Every structure is written in C-alpha cells, then in structure tokens.
C-alpha cells in the first residue's frame, strides 16, 4: 500500500509540476525577450553616444573647417578669386 500511495503522490506532483512548468517557461521566455529589448535600447544609445564622440575627437582645425558649409562660402568665392588675381599682378 505504501508503494501505491508513493507512486500516486509522485504522479500528482508530476502533473502539478508539468502545468507549472509551462507557466514558468512562458514567464522566463517573456523576461528574456524584455531583457533583450532593453539591451538593444541601451546599445542604440551607446552607438549614438559613440558617434557623437567620434565627431568631437577631430582635430581643432578640422572642427573649425567643418563649421563652414559651401552655401555660406559660395557667395564670396568670386570676390576672393578677384582679390587673389589682383594680388598676383
């Protein structure tokens, strides 16, 4: 009789555990997905920070020239060329 009760008790535990196992498995899966999404979000922030640092790592002279755009300088080019030509004469 004791062995029969032991087998039935173990079967009951096994059935209970199998239902809980599926729930636990789903919870773990959801937690892992959330962790992955959070890590990806943090990685995106780190990549943006690194890109900004790479721009700021330029030499001071290069940073000075990066500020100037062609549209700002282009209207003055004919005058600069004329002045340069006049200086050669």
Curated annotation (Swiss-Prot):
Its main location: secreted. Residues 19-59 form a propeptide. Expressed in entodermal epithelium along the body column. GO terms for cellular component: extracellular region. Residues 1-18 form the signal peptide. It is found in: Secreted; Target cell membrane. The modification Alanine amide is found at residue 86. Keywords: Amidation, Antibiotic, Antimicrobial, Immunity, Innate immunity, Membrane, Secreted, Signal, Target cell membrane, Target membrane. Belongs to the arminin family. Antimicrobial peptide with a broad-spectrum antimicrobial activity. Keeps its antibacterial activity under a wide range of salt concentrations that mimic physiological conditions of human blood, which is surprising, since Hydra is an obligate freshwater animal with nearly no salt tolerance. Does not affect red blood cells. This is Arminin 7519. It comes from Hydra vulgaris (Hydra).
